[in-house]
Amino acid sequence: MSGISLSLRQLDYRDWFQRKISRDIYGNSTWLTGIDLQKELTGHTGCVNTLDWSADGEFLLSGSDDTRLIVWDVFNEYKPRHLISTGHVQNIFSAKFVPYSNNRQILSASGDKLIKLFDLDSSKEGGMDHGMETQTRCWSCALDSVKNIVPCDNGHTFLVCSEDGTARQYDIREPHVCNQDLDCPSILVNYNPYRINLYTITMSPSNPYYFAIGGTHPYAFLYDRRMVKKSFRDDWTMNTSPEKDCRCVRKFSPDGSCNSQGILDRYITCCQFSAANPNELLVSWNSDYVYLFHVHEDKSYTPTFNKIEDSNKKPSKPSLLQTQPLKRKNYSPWYKNNFGASTPASRVSRNPYTAAQPRKHTFYQMYENIEKFFTTENGGLYESIVSGRLSHFSRSIQYVKDAIYFLENYNYIPDSNGLNHSIRVSALRYWRACVSILALMDDTVSLEPNTIIQAGWGWLYDFMNWVTRYLLGISDHWALQMSPPTNVARQNFVLCDPDEPSRVLFSNPSEMIRAFARIDTNDLSSVRRFFWIHKVLRGCLLLISSDIYWEQFQPWDSSTSDVTSSQRLDDENGFLTLLEPPVNYENEVESSSGENIVSMYTGHSDLNDDDDDYQDEESYSYASDDDDESDEDSDEGPTLLSLRMKKRKAVEPNVPVNTHVKSYYGHCNVESIKNVNFYGQNDEYVMSGSDDGRFFIWDKLNASILAIIHGDSEAVNVIEGHPRCPTLAVSGIDSTVKIFNTENTPPSGCSRNHTSNSYKIIATNEMNRQQGSRDSYITSRMLSHLAYRAHLDDGFGHEVLDTDACSIM
């Protein structure tokens, strides 16, 4: 008996030790820095769209485009334990173990609009392969692809969302027959009348009556199942509204607002409640970032689609770009936060710069005039500008900022003489760099988010950004890493003195970079400062300008008609008379004392308040709300877009909106539907995939990037953390599942951990994200409708396109 007691004590001690090890290691930040690929699981023949660990951590479930489910035995080297041929005829988007079923029951949802329940105990044949004999239930209520399944913790009920705009609740114990209409008792939320597709649904584990949904609408919605009128069958009619089915109690949006354009081009790819902290909700937007919300946040915004001013809102920490609450996709918090906490507030403007006067020059004339600010030859104004006369300097700054604003927001594109898009982007970047360099020459100049160099534009811009940040006191000397110069740049680069073109300052990029790196950070004399600003950076500007085909502006300018004057800045007097200051402008400048010298323009009363989003260097301006109204009132009648916008504005109009408390950036979420997840013993980390084939892990509290791991050849869409062990399962476009932990040390040069190269990765992703934010999206509903209208038949009554086969993940 004593031997048995000793064995029991040993078992208890072993269990206690294992639990302690799990608590100490699981989600440890030190472990995260050493994470790498352990194993790659092969068995699927299509993209793996869904992963789910069993509650005990013994099995991993995966579902794929090949319509099969595989259950992997975790503690038997991840060998396949069960292979299920589901009978689905389209991609499997979601698959989950049913709680309390001893890992024997599995739910699956597919693009064929079906939800199926499989019971492995019902298989009559032994072995690993299973077929339709294991299917015990099938629900066919949805009118479109079923995207997500969330099992309830009771083991009987589960929630689903579909691209038909509905969220539904089922009970596996109850029989259910449906004729695929909207008169169905399973419906909790019905957004079908608003033409909204739902992509994600999540339920709070601690408060299971709360669930959140998101899709092709800029808001995420929180619902309370306790307010569902399930007892009154008469309430379920064809005209059932979301308010009658289930009550929405909160909406979520970054900064608590969205603009009109966002109603159509922004959508949510994933929502996820925290298991450890029921008040926390993660939401991921396409072409945007991951945001953390507090469900019961006291501070909420009045729901509106107009511009929201919150002058009392204080930023969480000082930064260079302390702006208006961030209006989506225009400039990045990555750039904002990397400007550091030490930035003088006097150099900061809260709003993007906005011109206060009409355009007086063609764009080619603007180029010629701005060139004069940095040259001394051929009537150059450089010496006059830097001579110390504030009126010269402030007006030159205003002129460049106006040029940026006009080119960003000019939307007239002639059919025959269209301005090359790459030239437009190059010009905007160059003029932004001009503003940054001018800001170094005078301490009273403020920077706006649309007038600053951003990382990722190229190695020379990165170098100028590095120098500018350092000289402005924005970051320490080594705070910014650079992308390496290209081979062409190494061969052709020669930087000459802008005042003495025959004098070579640097003959290759490496020489210039090393020279700046050797600067004594504690002793930057005025002579050195003058050299790097007025010689090196000014020379870089002229070098960049020489590579831009400015002549392409001329034929485009000739077809424009909004220029009020064609006067050039031929001399200093012409320059001063052309830029006539507004009333009290000189007094404003002279009394600025370091404040924004153009603040009077950013709040000009004539500006369109609905134009919340300034367009950066790669975008064209969109129609404002006023434009939408005028379209609706035109002789041609309302447009499809205006009608859709009106419908989506009407979704839950009186529900309070919560703003985010944290944002996580660095990844790119444009090309596919990606999930987002918590990780750690107390959900202290945030994880998301990226279009570059990597996945990111952030510290939840300070939003810093802890790890960047390569997980797929194209894009990582799914990341799931093991419930007990420090292990991650990752999948994406590849047909394999990757298992990541720290058990294996990869050979030198073979590591998938790319955290050390974070700067270049983040900069590249930011550029791709901004480009993707301007690409129009198209849903499967839209694609099917277009296909139906365009290809009903081939003219002889023969169908040439199966619209039901059109599906987008």
UniProtKB/Swiss-Prot annotation:
**Chain positions of WD repeats:** 43-82, 87-128, 141-180, 193-233, 241-295, 668-708, 711-750
Q: What is this protein called?
A: WD repeat protein iqw1
SUPFAM superfamilies the record matches = WD40 repeat-like (SSF50978)
Q: Which Pfam families match?
A: WD40 (PF00400)
The alphabetical list of record keywords is: Cytoplasm, Repeat, WD repeat
Q: What is its main location?
A: cytoplasm
Q: Which PROSITE patterns match?
A: WD_REPEATS_1, WD_REPEATS_2, WD_REPEATS_REGION
Task: Give the multimer and partner information.
Answer: Interacts with ddb1.
Lineage, top ranks: Eukaryota, Fungi, Dikarya, Ascomycota, Taphrinomycotina
Q: What does this protein do?
A: Ligand-dependent coactivator of nuclear receptors that may function as a substrate receptor for CUL4-DDB1 E3 ubiquitin-protein ligase complex.
Compositionally biased residues, Acidic residues: 608-636
Superkingdom of origin: Eukaryota
Under the heading SMART domains, the entry gives: WD40
Region: Disordered, residue numbers: 599-644
Kindly indicate whether the keyword Lipid metabolism belongs to this entry: no
Query: Which gene underlies this protein?
Result: iqw1
GO CC list: Cul4-RING E3 ubiquitin ligase complex; cytoplasm; cytosol; nucleus
Recorded hits in InterPro entries, A to Z, give: DCAF8, WD40/YVTN_repeat-like_dom_sf, WD40_repeat_CS, WD40_repeat_dom_sf, WD40_rpt
Name one process (GO BP) from the record: negative regulation of fatty acid biosynthetic process
Compartment(s) of residence = Cytoplasm
